[in-house]
Curated annotation (Swiss-Prot):
MF terms (GO), sorted A to Z: hyalurononglucosaminidase activity
Swiss-Prot/TrEMBL catalytic activity: Random hydrolysis of (1->4)-linkages between N-acetyl-beta-D-glucosamine and D-glucuronate residues in hyaluronate
Protein name listed in UniProt: Hyaluronidase
Role played: Spider venom endo-hyaluronidase that is able to degrade purified hyaluronic acid (HA) and chondroitin sulfate (CS). Has no activity on dermatan sulfate (DS) and heparan sulfate (HS). Also increases the dermonecrotic effect of the dermonecrotic toxin (AC P0CE80), when injected in rabbit skin, supporting the hypothesis that venom hyaluronidases are spreading factors.
Tissues expressing this chain: Expressed by the venom gland.
KW Secreted (keyword) present: yes
Residues bearing attached sugar chains per UniProt: 129, 166, 243, 275
Family: Belongs to the glycosyl hydrolase 56 family.
PANTHER family reported for this sequence: HYALURONIDASE
Pfam families recorded: Glyco_hydro_56
């Protein structure tokens, strides 16, 4: 215990310079009724958890669809809520209610921390609304047809496409700008952006985002320019464990992380979402959890968000299972990798940046960050991602 506390103190000071923050976005306060307290355990491993284990708080707040404003969407039974689509929603009323919601859930006007907007019902890029989301395209076309009853079908489709993307942009952008205005010291992102939809492939290249997806994500330039963080998802799902080899899972993760690096603004932070629970009672395998955190860190990213559902802490047994998993897997993995990020920074980056391995075409550099403390990093493969004010391969020069 003493070793952990000493190391935690060292890391807290070191991360002021190089930064690798791991946030706890799990409703583990549900476990208090069973006498289980997660905050002391998580803090032993330098995991950022809200005071009193509140789900929304000083370190992190996520706004689900029903918790921020008047989000227009279509329900499972095709029932329209708040207009159903952005074009029919009341944006002014939405922003007024959003302001109330933000002030309620983030009380401190000067609060720092990470704030995430989780809107998943529809996608702002028209052609990304496929499969079950095609209902949004259909509803948008019906609205356009009402105002253009004699227009050719191709004209209706083009108008619907343009109006959808313009309206979606207005809703997402104005909501993000409102959050930044009300809580300017916090870092803001949309969950699951960017996505890659890279579900199949037989090589590292084939698991990269396709050209069509990259072009679609490029049309979200307005989102990347306004976001102070990007928060993609690299969750491990049960189907991946049964249908993918370990190598394919590595490539899948890499493809999504590479797209986040590609679209993020230079000063934007990157906090990918990872999971510890695949379904209630089934935890992410130990080697997979270590790999997820290490892959994020090996690309010089700012940290990660650990997410869990209310169902994953919905019983005494599940709470006990999570507490054991933190002590055995999640905590040690987080602490080791945070420590190695700091150590590599000191060895290679003059303590002024994070190590990256830009020529890592085989996606193996993450393994360096799971090694034990006596491992020496080979500087010849490393380029440093420098903190503001420094530059050079090893952050050895002050910015002119």
């Amino acid at each position: 215990m003493q070793t952990i506390l000493v190391l935690t103190t060292f890391l807290s000071a070191w991360f002021l310079a190089v930064g690798f923050d791991v946030f706890w976005n799990v409703p583990s306060q549900q476990c208090k009724k069973y006498g289980m307290k997660f905050v002391p355990l998580l803090e032993q491993y330098s995991i950022l958890v809200n005071k009193e284990d509140n789900f929304k708080g000083d370190k992190i707040t996520i706004f689900y669809e029903s918790q921020l404003g008047l989000y227009p969407h279509i329900g499972a039974n095709d029932e329209s809520f708040n207009g159903g689509i952005p074009q029919l929603g009341d944006l002014k009323a939405h922003l007024e209610k959003s302001a109330v919601d933000i002030r309620r859930d983030i009380l401190d006007k000067s609060a720092t921390g990470l704030r995430i907007i989780d809107w998943e019902a529809w996608r702002p890029i028209w052609e990304f609304n496929w499969s079950s989301l095609r209902k949004y395209q259909d509803k948008m076309k019906k609205v356009v047809r009402q105002f253009n009853p004699t227009a050719h079908e191709s004209t209706v489709a083009k108008l619907a496409h343009n109006e959808w993307e313009n309206s979606s942009k207005s809703w997402m952008l104005s909501t993000l700008q409102l959050g930044k205005q009300l809580r300017p010291n916090s870092v803001w992102c949309y969950y699951l952006f960017p996505d890659c939809y890279n579900y199949d492939g037989n090589s590292v290249q084939e698991f990269q985002c396709s050209e069509a997806i990259r072009k679609g994500n490029d049309r979200l330039k307005w989102l990347w320019e306004e976001s102070t963080a990007v928060c993609p998802s690299i969750y491990i799902k049960e189907g991946q464990l049964t249908n993918y080899t370990l190598q394919k899972r590595i490539w899948f993760t890499n493809g999504r992380l590479q797209e986040a690096l590609r679209v993020a603004q230079p000063k934007a932070r990157i906090y990918p979402y990872i999971n510890y629970s695949i379904k209630p009672g089934m935890m992410v395998p130990e080697v997979e959890f270590w790999r997820l955190i290490a892959q994020i860190a090996s690309l010089g990213m700012d940290g990660a968000v650990i997410w869990g559902s209310s169902a994953s802490v919905g019983s005494k047994n599940h709470c006990a299972q999570l507490m054991k998993y933190i002590a055995d897997v999640l905590g040690p993995a987080t602490l080791r990798i945070k420590e190695n990020v700091a150590r590599c920074s000191k060895q290679a980056c003059s303590g002024r940046g994070r190590c990256t391995w830009p020529k890592d075409t085989s996606v193996i550099a993450w393994k360096f960050l799971v090694e034990k403390e006596d491992y020496d990093f080979y500087l010849g493969d490393i380029e440093c991602k420098c903190v503001e004010g420094y530059e050079g391969r090893y952050c050895e020069q002050k910015t002119k």
